[in-house]
Structure formats: structure tokens, C-alpha cells
Amino acid sequence: MTRKQRRMTIIGGSLAVLALAAALVLNALRDSIVFFSTPTMVAEKHVQAGKRFRLGGLVQPGSLQRGDNLAVSFEVADGNAKLPVAYKGILPDLFREGQGVVAEGALDANGVFKADTVLAKHDETYMPKDVADALKKQGHWKDDYGGKASDGVKPAATTAQGNPQGAVR
């Protein structure tokens, strides 16, 4: 075997081993790569009780029930299916019926998703309540904040420190 053939054999073997390792890692992480599963995906996969995963969807309007000691139950829906969720803890400020939510936990034997973490989702038009209140108080609030400005006015430029240019301190 010449030096070139030996070198090509080593490179080919190394690439084969690397491809096999990548395939094994991706296979092991297959279910973890998805950020969350929807109620429809959970129903189709027939998820085993006790297996941890993230559940995402919209909080079904009218399904929120508060119990004793911070216990909360609600349904997460995706348009096709809905899944009951039980959670014990303080809900995020953005949590509301009809809003997006991602819950982390596992299904119990009765098909109820027992969440130990609940995250409220918001869209790109979200503005923290404190900021919105401050803008309203100062008289700078516009109903279209968070969306595109209807009057064609662009937002003020900011400096590297994140302060508006020309801002009075």
C-alpha cells in the first residue's frame, strides 16, 4: 500500500467513525431536540407515564381552576387536542387563559400532565407592564406600541450603552 492509499484509508475510516458517533448522539437526543410537544403530538406518540418532556400550546379559555396551597389546574390545547395540566406553585405574571404556555413535567397514570415548571410565552409585541405604565404616565404611550408605527415614525436610535441618543438624564 502506498503512502497516499494509507492516508486515504485513515481519513475514510476516521470519517466513518465520526459519522457513526454523530448518528448515535442524534438518535439518543431525538426526543430532546424538540423544544416542546403539543397535545396532538403527545396523543399520537402515546407518551409513557413518568417520562419527562415539555408541553406547549395555548391555555384553554375557561379551564383555569385554582385550588388550595397554590395548586392550579388548566388545559393546554393546540386546536386539535387538549391535555389537562396540574401545577403547584406560583404562575408567571404573563400566564393567562388564551395565552401560550410551555410546561415541563411528566404524564401521570391518569393522563394528567403534572408540571413542575410553567413558562408563559409572549409574542414580539410584548412590553413589560412597568414600562407600559411608565409610558402611559408620561403621556408617551401609543396604542400601536409593539407593532409597526402607523405614522411612519422610526424609534429613536440608541447608543452602545442602550441609552436613547439625546436623552436627558
From Swiss-Prot:
| Record-level GO cellular component terms | plasma membrane
BP term (GO), one: cytochrome complex assembly
Q: Which Pfam families match?
A: CcmE
> Could you name the domain of life of the organism this protein comes from?
Bacteria
Transmembrane annotation, as ranges = 8-28
Tell me which parts of the chain lie in the Cytoplasmic compartment. Answer: 1-7
Q: What does this protein do?
A: Heme chaperone required for the biogenesis of c-type cytochromes. Transiently binds heme delivered by CcmC and transfers the heme to apo-cytochromes in a process facilitated by CcmF and CcmH.
Q: What is this protein called?
A: Cytochrome c-type biogenesis protein CcmE
In which organism is this protein found? Bradyrhizobium diazoefficiens (strain JCM 10833 / BCRC 13528 / IAM 13628 / NBRC 14792 / USDA 110)
